[in-house]
Structures are given as C-alpha cells and as structure tokens.
Swiss-Prot record:
Compositional bias segments (type: Basic and acidic residues): 99-108, 271-280
Organism encoding this protein: Saccharomyces cerevisiae (strain ATCC 204508 / S288c) (Baker's yeast)
Record region (Disordered): 1-46, 77-149, 226-254, 269-288, 293-323, 384-506, 944-977
Phosphoserine: residues carrying this PTM: S202, S205, S208, S229, S283, S284, S410, S414, S1130
Start-end of DNA-binding region: 47-76
Cellular component terms per the entry's GO annotation: cytoplasm; nucleus
Keyword Ribosomal protein part of the UniProt annotation: no
Protein name in the entry: Glucose transport transcription regulator RGT1
Amino acid sequence: MNELNTVSTNSSDSTKNGGTSNSPDDMDSAAAASHAIKKRTKASRACDQCRKKKIKCDYKDEKGVCSNCQRNGDRCSFDRVPLKRGPSKGYTRSTSHPRTNEIQDHNNSRSYNTFDNSNNTLNNNTGNSGDNGINSNTVPSTPSRSNSVLLPPLTQYIPQAGGIPPSFQNPAIQSTMPAGNIGQQQFWKVPYHEFQHQRKGSIDSLQSDISVRTLNPNEQLSYNTVQQSPITNKHTNDSGNANGSVTGSGSASGSGGYWSFIRTSGLLAPTDDHNGEQTRRSSSIPSLLRNTSNSLLLGGQPQLPPPQQQSQPQAHQQKLQQGQNLYSYSQFSQQQPYNPSISSFGQFAANGFHSRQGSVASEAMSPSAPAMFTSTSTNPVNVAQQTQRPQGQQVPQFSSELDGNKRRQSAPVSVTLSTDRLNGNENNNGEINNNNGSNNSGSSKDTSQHSQESVTTPAALEASSPGSTPQRSTKKRRKSYVSKKTKPKRDSSISITSKDSAHPMTTSSTIAYGQISDVDLIDTYYEFIHVGFPIIPLNKTTLTSDLLLVNTQPISNIHEVNSYVILWFRNSLELLVRVALKQKPGGKFFDNIVGVALSPSNDNNKAGFTTATARDDAEKTRRDSHNEVQDTLEVQSVFIAALNECFQKIVDIHPKFRENNDQISPKIKVIYLSTFILLNYILAFVGYDNSFVLGMSVTIFNEFKLYKLLLFPEPDINDVKPPVDEEVSTGNGNTKTSEFEIGSESAGHMNPSNSPNSMDENISHYSVLFKRLYVLLSVFDSLQSCAFGGPKLLNISIQGSTERFFSNDLGSKWCLEQSQLRLKSVLQSLKLGELMSELTRNRISMNGNRKPGFDITNSSSLLSEYVETQPLSVAQLFCKLLIGKHNFINCLLSLYDSEAGVYSDLTLDLSSKIADSLCSLISIILQVLTLILRLNPTNSIDFNYRPPNPPANNPTVQEGPSAMGSSPVAGNLSAAPPSEGNPDFYKKLLGLKQDTGTILSDLCRGIISPFAIAILHEVYNITELVKQMPTSLISIMMTATTTQNTQDTKKSQDLVMKLSNSMNEVVQITSVLTMIKPFKIFEHELNKPIMSLTGGLSSTTRNDVMWPKSGQGLRESSVMKTLLDERRTSGTQPTTAPVAAEEPRLENVALENFVSIGWKLLDDSELGWY
C-alpha cells in the first residue's frame, strides 16, 4: 500500500510540475521524486515578493498564489535563482545518494548527449574556441539538479603539463576517475568569473557540478602559488600558445613612436578582468615582461572573459587608437604583437636585480600601484594571498583610456582615469557594492550585477548610485567603505581619505604612474619646463621623431633594456609634472589621481585636470581628521618613496649597461643619462638635500667617461651638423658618421669598441648630446654646492660651454630649441648655472691661497656682454645680483686693512661708492622679486596661465638682432627704481604696459625653474643683512654735511635721496617676499635662525644686535673671518703689539658694522644659501 501511495504521489507531482515554470519544486523535481514520502506542510520556497519583504509565505500549488500577494493584488513569481543548499545535518558521502538507478541512468545519458552535442559544436568552431562558454577539453560529470547552470571550468586557471590539453578518446574513463583528488586543490581560493543570475555551488556538491571536470593524476597540484621565473616556465609557453587563442585587446603591430611597451599591457589578460588589477602590488618591471611571465604562469591557456562585456572594450580601444594616431610621435597607439620569447632579462623581471636583494626600497612600489597613501602589511598570509593571485589580470591602459579623454584645446595634459580602473578589486569589493545597493537603491534589481563594477573610491561609489542624491550617497558609502577596509583578504589599498590610514613614516607608499598620457607629458615638458631649464637637451621634433624611436620588443637583452630604461624615464618625467602641478589649497601632488571621477559636466574645475564633485568634501574630511603635521609627513613620505623608487630602478639597470655597452644604442644612453638629470631637477625643484642622488649620478656619468669629451679635443657642433640630413663619408676613409646612421636599422646594434667602458667611437654625432648632459649635471652640482655649502663634485670648468654646445644653428637637427626667443631664455638659465659653477670652483674655503676679496672680474666681463643683449629674465637678473653681491663684498672688506689693523677713512667718495653699490644691489633684488611675482610666483604648472607663443617671425636669423636691439633699453627702463618718478613701473609689474622688454620677459610666463627656491633663499639672506645699511649711511651723511663745503653738501643730499629710495625699496621687498611661494613638498622657513648669518642668534634678537655700538658680536660670529685669521696667523709670526684702543667714533662704529656685514655675506656665499 505504501508503495502504491508512493508511486501515485510521484506521478501526480511529476504531472503537476512538468509544465509549470514558476513552481517551487521545479528546481528539484528529480530529487523530490525519491524523497516525497509525505506532502509538505509549508511552502518549500518563498516567492520573490515575500522574500523581499521578509515575511512568511504560504504559497500552495492548488491556489497558485500566496495570501500576501493575493491581498496586495500581486502575482507570485519565483524569478530569483536560489543558491545551492549545503548538505543536510548528518550528511555523509556514503549515504548521500539515495537515488534510484533509473534516475541516475536517465541523468547520465542526458549529460552525455549534451556533451556530445557541445563537443561537435566546438569542433566546428575551433577558431573561436577562446570565446566559448565551455572549453572543448571539459568533461562534465553528473549534474546535481535538472536545472544546473554552466559555470566556467575551474581548470581554466590550472596550467596543464606542457600546455597540452587532454584528449577525449575515452570520456567514460575520465568521468569515473575518483573525484577526491580535487579536494587537494583549494579551489575556493582561486578566483573565477561569476555569470550573472547564477548560483554558487556548495563545497560538498563539487563532484556533481558540471562546471568542474575530473583531472588526470598528472595534473594535480600544478597551480603555481608563487610567481616563477619566466626562464623556468619558458617551455610551457610555446606549446601553450600553439593550442590556445589569445583573447585580449591586442591589435595589429606598428612601427615608430615610443614607449610602446606600456601599450602592450593586457595582451594576454581578458578584456574585463585586467581592469581590477591596477590595485595589485606587482613587481616593478615593464608590463611587456609581466605579460610574458603571465602567459607562462597560466600555461598559455586563454582565460574566459565574462559574457556581454567583451566587444565594448575592444571597440573602445580601437576608437582610442584612432585618436592617438593623430600624434605622429605617440607609440602608445601601436601595440606590438605578442612574442613568446623571453631572455635572461626576464630573471630580473620576476626576481629583481641583484642589487635589489634586501633593498630598503620595496618591490611593492611599482607603476601599477594605486595612487593612494597605502599601508603594506607584512603578514605572511597577506603576502601569500598576493602571490597566489593569477597574473593574467593586467594594468589597464593609461591615460588615453577615456575618450582620449576629450582633450581640451586649452589644456595639453589631462589626467584621465579609466572607468575600469575605478572598478578595481572585483573579487573583494562585491560585498561592498551589494550592501550599498541594497541600502540605497530603490529598485528590485539583482545586486549581483554590481559585482563586476565594484569601485574602490567614495567618488566612484557616488557615480554608481543613480537612485540617491550625491551628497547623501557619498556619505553613506564612504562609511561602508571604511568599515570594510580592514578585512585581511582585501588586497586593495586604503584611500587617503580613510580615517584609519597608517602613519606615513612606517609605510611603503608610492603613486600610480601612467595617469598622464605620453603625448601630454612631452607637450607639457616643452611648454612649461624646457624653456626654464633643458632637462632633455634636444628639441621636441628630434626627440619624438628620432631619439624615442627604439625597439622595445623582447627580441634580445638589449631591447628589454630599452623597454626598462624608457619606462622609468617616463615615470620620472610624470613624477616631475605631477609635483609641479598647481595644487588647490590643502591639496597634495598625488590628489590629482586619487578619487578622480571624470565627468563631462565638470567644466567648472581647472582645465586639464578634472576632479569629482566630492573632491572638496574629501579634502575637508581629510583636514578634519588629520592635523597639519601629519599631512606634511604624509606628502613628504609619498614623495620620497616615489623618488627613491625611480632612482633605485634606474640604478639597477646600470650593470646591464656595463655588460652590453657596445650593443646599446646611443639613443638609450641619452635617455638613460637624461633620467639622472631629471631626478636631480626634481630635487632642486623641491629644495630637498639628497646628495646621494647627485653622487651616484656623478659616478655613473664618470663610468661612461663623459669628462673626456670636454677635456680632450672633439669636433664642435658645426662639424657634427652635416650627417644630420644626408650620409657623409669623409675623404680620408673615416666612416665614423656613416657607420651609425641616425634612425637606421643599425641604431640598436653598434660595432664593438676597444674600450668597453668608454663612449663608442661611432657616435661622434651624438657626442654633442653627451657634452650637454655633462654640463647640465655640472650645473646641478654647482647649484647644490651653492645652496647647501657642500663641495663641488665635478671640478671640470664649464666656462664658455653654453656658446660651444647649446647655441647652435636653429636649422640643425640637434638644436636645443627651434624658436629663437625661447632659445635665448634657455641659454640664460644655462649661463646662470655656468656662473654658479665658476663661483663654487673659486671658493675661498676651497682655495687656501686666495685672499678674501678674490676677483671675479673675468666672470663679470664674460657675463656682462651676454646680459645686455638678451631679453629680461629671472636668470639674467640673478646673475647680475650674484656679481653685484661679490662686488659689494669686496667693497666692504676693503674698508679694513687686516695687516695694519686700521679702518679706512669714511670720506664722501668712499661713502658714495658704498651707497651706489648698496642701492644697485637692493634695486636688483626688487627687480628679481617683481619679475618672479609677475611670471610665476608659485613656480607651478598652471594651464590657465600658459607661456605665450613667440612671434611667428622670430625664428628667422635676420629678425633676431632687430628684436634684441631694443632689449637693453627695456632692461634699463625696468631697472629704474620704482620710486624715482617712474609711473610705468607698476603698470609693467601688473602686465598692463606692453613694451618690448615686457613682451620678451613674458616668454617665460608660467615657466617653472629649478632655481626658484635657491633664488628666494639668497634674496632673503642678502636683504636681511643689508636692509639697515641705508639708515646707517644716511645718519653718517647728515653728520658729515656740517663740515663740508657747498658742492659736497649737494652731493651728500643726492646720496641721502638715493638711500631714502632704497629704504622704500626694502619695504617693497619685504611685502613682495610674502607673496612668492615656490615651495613644494618641503616647507622652507626663510626667517628661521641661520647660523651662517647670525652665528646662532635667534630670529627675535637678530635685529636688536645687528647694529650694536661695537661690532664685536658680528665679527666673532663670522666663520670665514675666523678661518682666514687662523691661516694668516699660522703662516706669519706676530709682529708688533696692537695699538691702544681709542674712543670709537660714529664713523668707526659704522665701518665695523659694514665690515661685519661683508664677512656675513661672504659666509653666505661659502657656507650655503639654505
């Protein structure tokens, strides 16, 4: 009877549920047939409406609707796909299959038929096997339910032995393999793609899931938990690529351009999966090498991209490539084909260089690291999780990923964050998105749709919630974001807007490079940086069309070195640009990237760098949660880490240069050495003392024997120009120029030389570039010596090198600048460096035989002719200031005869001489400050304040002298003191008067300079020392007028009027100093106590004792006076006793003070300006 009831019940249930799609027992019909001994007393599953409201559902098949839906007039629906249930209580494998043999046979036959049909379909479409949902080498097992869903096979992420897929000759044997071996693989730690509207399988139902096939015993535990060297896995790459098709964003190959290796990122990764990998900490190697190692790690098998999202990135990328092709010198738009070959350089890619073993610089600091202030945990579990992540996900393409991104004509640089980058951490942020969607969204959409669009920043969270207001959603989601950030399995970096970020001094932090496109970097450099100081000693056309056209494909060691060098040259240039960008109040240099959600409606922000609407809220939150000291330490920590990373990476490649010096192209050598110039420029730009970078730069320059090019006779640049446009063969059979044709195929492979450590003899027409680079390094050496008082490292004189190596013909391919007026501005900054080099080489402290008042008339005469024929610039005026300062020191120190021990008589002529020198010095200081205030008071790159384009007719050599002819007049007009009845001074200061001098000086408007902070320090030091001298001289003149005749009285009155004007200028200088803020990263206190100026006196008491009745205090605090007195006494015996001191007169007290000021000015020159 029971059997009869069971049969009747089963038949009725199967009849009832056979054609019903909304029945709750439809998903488990086969299993219910074997267990339905008694009828259910309640609904086995709540309808979607009751589940949403979280109320009890009493749905019954007889009614077809539950009471709640009937009351509300709704219809019961069961559209939501449920998750698989776990095993029941007391579940064991031995008793887990109470099914009948008939049902099992039925299911097995149905699954095999399904497999045969799919296998035939895949065999007919082998060309598109990488895009199919089920791989052809997948053997399904018995499904657990009749409505089982197809998940991507887990074995997609497990490399095969030798990359050969298993055969399917005997599927029955494979289906009967023991599935217990699968338990050895911790498959729940392997990420896989979740298809939308599909359920997850439980752990215990793995062997009944069709998404997992049984494995051969030889394939077990072949998943690499640690990234291996490309060399050890090289054999798996060739066979793997032969059988699998690459599904990525790779395009046709191209030639020309530069920095192509960055565009090769994502060649092997899925088009959607690699977007979330931007926050992964990876080895700081070129993406070209990472792609190769990734393909080897995965055994050459393609990864299955999520459906419905594959065609959009490819079409989007093709659109971007068409936009990038507008620039002839951009190789970002031309991806190279994948080459499976990898050489020994890959060992450096996977394991790092030998010099990096045990290095302080962390490998986590890489171009793929996020632009956030992060906290790197040293927990071994976290490290293991980072190493176990599959390497197929690549860094998204850089700045041009967002429509180019509609680059505005008014701004050449646009930081464009990819929307895919904002969707990073797809595996870890799904919970956050789901929670936010359920809390803030009013729609009933499945929240699993957001799992592939997870965002990591509050600004991006705001953009992902259309159902709520921006302010409210931003606030709520930031709270949820912060609450989830401490989970140990989350590898994403913590945003700087979070309140619980670690202390900056104890973390390894860096910025994410690649946010600015290559085109924008080059354009920004030549518009805002090159005119101020030529880091790259070459014009833009030759750089982009010749020098950067190098092969970076992994054909050999040399080409991989090329890729590595260009990568870190580019990163260093981007670091400079981002540090130099004008920041908002309270902003940071890495805030240009973090939390940026690009929106076309953000037109109210500054051109070039578009920020999200929540940017101000984030800044306010950060200011409220961190004090000023912590913010300063954070910025400094990130900057130092980024600078050290660039420096460490570029130094690591030097052993490869020494080993392959003969094969490395001179183009790469120029780029490599320019990177060191770039890093020294960054240090000078922010005013940071890091002598290690300069010292290592000098060492590497000496390794290349560049000093020989300056010391020994070499053909000048006029002899180098002929081979630029045509091939030249000399009559004496010398083929130095023809053996190495620029831009030819042999550029990457040079003939061997007898001296491997010296520059090759076949690069004579590149020698001018190496000479320029050596001169630039000597300039930075001199600048650091002047600023910090250290000894000069390069003692080779560069006097006259500006005219010899930089001011060449404009038509030459190797010219420095193609515009005549811009070239003159560049040469002025170089002449300033040349002067500082001569001053440091002739220091008194470094030359014991020299007297205090050493003569620099040769340098003055050399500079005077040059200064008078050039447009007005800050570098020109500062040269005049340095020369005037040394002349003033000589004048003051000559007032005291050290041998006789007496002061000179302060006559009217001597007083007039001192007053003229002092007034000229103060006038030049005011001119320097006013010009800085008008051109670029913050020394920042501001796209709303661009340099003007030079006149169209200026490049002609014939019109150059005529344009320069009026510059001395303009210089004289601007040099006139503003208080001497010159009403046009303030018009020129505000830019209202446009004469020749103003137009020429405006060519440097918006230009940044590495000398800005050093100039401001020196100007402040001189002003502090001489600001009270006019008052003292006026008092002396007023006292002396009673004993002078009428003619002398009139002359004294003129001097008093002139000194009164200087006092007025000192007041203006004090006010202008407060408006000039060129400081970046590091704050410089100009009014802090300076030992070299006051000998340990505090800033509050300095002014009180500056003019005492006796000058003993200042004289004793002079370091140089003490040093020279010791040298004098050690060389000579004391002669007669000193004369008895007389009652000091006013003139003698003033003379003592003047001499003391002279010694203090000498201390400033010898001991450093900072």
